[in-house]
């Protein structure tokens, strides 16, 4: 990867374009990470709705990090084949399709398939959070960009159960997805 960034001004200052690009990627990653833990409070309600036991319902939580983890090394291959923009939009589309499938799931199998799609999109989004600042910021500003991304991304899994519980209590589990 080159040390030359593609959107930096000659004076080395951070531009609104750079901030916007990284903010969009970090927001996508935040939502993907939030989705990893937001389902925890919904498990009892989902168990009741689909008449499944706890060991079966646990797949809702387990499948996400499993598939997401598999997709991270796959994304290295994809980054070599496609632009970061195309990968971001593709991963976001896969994540959104999975989300829609989960929200409309008529049974547990469709819910799991939706979670697999969400996780596949998430697994491609996560590496982009590291790659995009390297492409967008000059060397001397990359640490700042990565630090900001890290702060936002660490909040996703932390607030997931709280947000999930509040949404479930107010609107139901399908809205939360």
Q: Predicted regions: what is each one?
A:
Residues 2-177:
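Transmembrane-helix bundle of Major Facilitator Superfamily
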């Amino acid at each position: 990867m080159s040390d030359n960034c593609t959107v930096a001004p000659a004076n080395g200052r951070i531009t609104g374009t750079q901030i916007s690009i990284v903010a969009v990627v970090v927001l996508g990653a935040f939502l993907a990470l939030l989705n990893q833990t937001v389902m925890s409070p919904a498990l009892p309600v989902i168990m009741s709705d689909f008449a499944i036991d706890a060991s079966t319902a646990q797949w809702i939580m387990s499948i996400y990090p499993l598939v997401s983890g598999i997709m991270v090394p796959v994304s290295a291959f994809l980054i070599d084949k496609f632009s970061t923009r195309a990968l971001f939009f593709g991963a976001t589309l896969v994540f959104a399709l999975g989300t829609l499938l989960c929200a409309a799931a008529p049974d547990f199998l469709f819910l799991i398939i939706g979670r697999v799609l969400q996780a596949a999109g998430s697994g491609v989004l996560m590496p982009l959070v590291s790659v995009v600042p390297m492409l967008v910021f000059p060397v001397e500003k990359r640490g700042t960009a990565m630090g900001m991304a890290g702060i936002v991304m660490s909040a996703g899994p932390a607030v997931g159960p709280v947000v999930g519980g509040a949404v479930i209590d107010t609107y139901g589990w399908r809205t939360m997805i």
